[in-house]
């Protein structure tokens, strides 16, 4: 890989994308155990012979889960942390933090508590902390997995900026469409081997069946369409009347009116920090500070009762994986689990080979599938998925979509917080749009509503805006 080159690594979950990034930043062999054959050279030096602090000055890493790379509790300290460890004078350090926030246009995220940021905002701070150190090589492991469409466009501009600065960029990613204009080469991995190296032009020539057979997501969102027909709305079973949600006395959403019927799959969209996760937590009874009425089958249902009838798959699934094996996780905390259902769900989601593995040893996409499997087995009537396709390849995304359709057929009420246009077109019947504390749009997922859906997901002319 030469200077100023942008190389995209793609392939199914667990194919070795993250392992390659760990080889380049020295985490293999200096942190992760295993057998290493062959050599990895950075600037002509073997990586295993370079001290970690010197590697960190040359190679900047943005991990798949930004939470794993934070060392501070506020955003300014986090951005400054790397350069602080280079012992820069306080004045230069302050200037670099200022320059970083200006270059990346994240002034609004300054002086914020990291624990109060949305997943997408955390991702921006993780990138900023690396950018501040001005490394020559950038490694990004699925940097878009927590971002809304507007933030993905901002990420694309950031990548364009560092490319202009003469940096080398290595990206492991499932979402491919936003990188087609930036990547110089696309490396396709399968089961730990390089199976193909393409130019963007060659990659565009792949037919849709070929691409799907390789387990790859769409390269052009303009070629993704919702179903033509719209099923009639079912009788409402869940109703929200005049619901207002607050966080630390600040109103997040106000006067929300909504109804949902059995079998409905409802997408929830909005920019990072619009209140989508707060809304989903309130549905499940996990958020206390709210006014208004929640009704189930026309009867008021209090917060504690909602806790009992609902299940939520969180954006960061590491928070809800507790057991020592994948199989045990699928029945963790469930009275009298149906073992036949457990086996069938593991098989459907491609998790049977990993049933004895500890969940924490799985890739990000595999962990996501485990959490989705639990939602299938738990038997609750109201299911909420917060970004269920973050970190998922095409195969896993279609498996999760199929599972959600099955849950819908079982009469579950399903809400999906997502930024994934491809997934929404495959699974959702409606999309709710949150913006500035309100819910201005409730849009059916049909061909008739395609222009509005593309507007909500910022899809334009085959690229995102």
Predicted regions and their residues:
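Conserved ABC ATPase "signature" region
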Residues: 91-109, 339-354
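Conserved ABC ATPase signature
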Residues: 113-117, 121, 358-362, 366
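The feature captures the beta-strand-to-loop junction immediately N-terminal to the Walker
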Residues: 10-12, 269-271
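Conserved beta-strand-loop-alpha-helix hinge in the C-terminal portion
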Residues: 193-215, 438-461
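Catalytic Walker B motif of ABC-type/P-loop ATPase nucleotide-binding domains
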Residues: 138-141, 383-386
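H-loop/switch region of ABC-family ATPase nucleotide-binding domains
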Residues: 173-174, 418-419
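Helix-to-loop junction immediately C-terminal to a conserved catalytic motif
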Residues: 25, 284
């Amino acid at each position: 890989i030469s200077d100023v080159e942008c190389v995209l690594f793609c392939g199914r979950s667990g194919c070795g994308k993250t392992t390659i990034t760990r080889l380049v930043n020295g985490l293999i062999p200096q942190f992760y155990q295993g057998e290493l054959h062959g050599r990895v050279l950075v600037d002509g030096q073997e990586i295993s012979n370079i001290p970690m602090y010197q590697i960190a000055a040359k190679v900047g890493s943005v991990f798949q889960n930004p939470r794993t790379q934070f060392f501070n509790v506020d955003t300014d300290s986090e951005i400054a942390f790397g350069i602080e460890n280079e012992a820069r004078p306080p004045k230069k350090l302050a200037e670099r933090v200022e320059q970083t926030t200006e270059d990346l246009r994240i002034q609004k995220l300054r002086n914020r508590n990291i624990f109060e940021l949305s997943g997408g905002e955390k991702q921006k701070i993780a990138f900023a902390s690396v950018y501040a150190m001005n490394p020559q090589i950038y490694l990004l492991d699925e940097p878009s997995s927590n971002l809304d469409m507007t933030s993905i466009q901002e990420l694309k501009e950031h990548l364009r900026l560092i490319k202009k600065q003469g940096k080398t960029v290595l990206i492991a990613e499932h979402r491919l469409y936003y990188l087609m204009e930036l990547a110089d080469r696309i490396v396709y991995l399968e089961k730990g081997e390089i199976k193909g190296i393409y130019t963007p032009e060659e990659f565009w020539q792949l037919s849709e069946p070929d691409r799907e057979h390789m387990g790859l997501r769409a390269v052009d969102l303009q070629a993704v369409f919702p179903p033509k027909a719209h099923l009639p709305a079912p009788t409402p079973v869940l109703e929200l009347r005049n619901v207002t949600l607050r966080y630390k006395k600040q109103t997040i959403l106000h006067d929300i009116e909504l109804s949902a019927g059995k079998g409905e799959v409802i997408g929830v969209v909005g920019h990072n920090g619009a209140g989508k996760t707060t809304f989903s937590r309130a549905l499940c009874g996990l958020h206390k500070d709210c006014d208004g009425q929640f009704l189930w089958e026309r009867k008021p249902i209090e917060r504690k009762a909602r806790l009992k009838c609902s299940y939520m798959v969180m954006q960061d699934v590491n928070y809800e994986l507790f057991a020592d094996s994948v199989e045990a996780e699928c029945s963790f905390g469930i009275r009298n689990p149906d073992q036949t259902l457990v086996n069938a769900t593991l098989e459907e989601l491609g998790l049977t080979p990993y049933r004895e593995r500890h969940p924490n040893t799985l890739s990000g996409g595999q962990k996501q599938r485990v959490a989705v499997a639990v939602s299938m087995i738990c038997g609750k009537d109201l299911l909420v998925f917060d970004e269920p396709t973050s970190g998922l390849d095409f195969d896993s995304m279609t498996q999760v979509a199929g599972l959600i359709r099955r849950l819908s057929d079982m009469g579950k009420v399903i809400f999906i917080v997502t930024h994934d246009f491809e997934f929404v077109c495959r699974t959702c019947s409606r999309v709710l749009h949150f913006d500035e504390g309100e819910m201005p749009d409730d849009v059916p997922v049909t061909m008739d509503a395609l222009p509005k859906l593309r507007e909500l997901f910022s899809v334009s002319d085959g690229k995102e805006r």
